[in-house]
């Protein structure tokens, strides 16, 4: 059972329907990144950006040791600052150096730990660079913490009448709908909203920071291509089956925050039976891709309103 907290019955119905249809091909397969979050440190008024960048990288292990000197259960369990990256960006306020602390937060979402580390090392970074540290804050674009899910559907499983011909026609319609979302940001916005219908419903049910998750997922949808596009990818393989995948940031936690103290969130995590934040991330991404396919299948066949309004009427 996967708990959803959402006002639309059709969201639950669509995701459940597609989850059933992929069982014969092994269901949803997940392969998630380690739970690494990014802490950003903004450095201004640097005389020589290249020299300052090299100085930070030379002092990397000293800075990491400072981060990991904090008394923390997360660090005792093998988490902590694992690497440091430095980026140069040009802005309307002039060039800046941006330090990224890469922090393994284990089963926590990790915002408080990452922010504490960023503030802790800021003085040392000013000393090393001769610059002025300004902002020190977690990034919600968790590009090192991606949830990755794939699923495969036969034409027979997607058909209305169990025949391969009907299912193949439906797959064609689904791919045409997907290509629309890939190429048009107006369509991609609604397409991705449907994916987040499921992801955010689980996030809310399980006491997660659903606003952070939403922000990260939508930002990631434009990072790779430079334009806003579909969060999912769909294609037909050599067997004529529909193969879908999603790869998106998923900063979730099973310890700390509301997931630990809110009784409903605790109960819902217990229903899920997840043992780690990575497992929760995979389930949420799987629900997202299931919901996406359910919406596209409806749009490509009978239209979205018939099933939606029928379930909507039951709620009234």
Regions found by a protein language model. Give the residues of each.
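Glycine-rich anion/phosphate-binding loop at the beta-strand->alpha-helix junction
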Residues: 107-109, 114-264
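Short, ordered loop/turn segments at secondary-structure junctions
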Residues: 7, 138-141, 301
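A structural-propensity feature for long, helix-poor, extended segments
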Residues: 25-57, 163-166, 221-293
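Electropositive phosphate-/nucleotide-binding environments in soluble metabolic enzymes
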Residues: 9, 53, 57, 61, ...
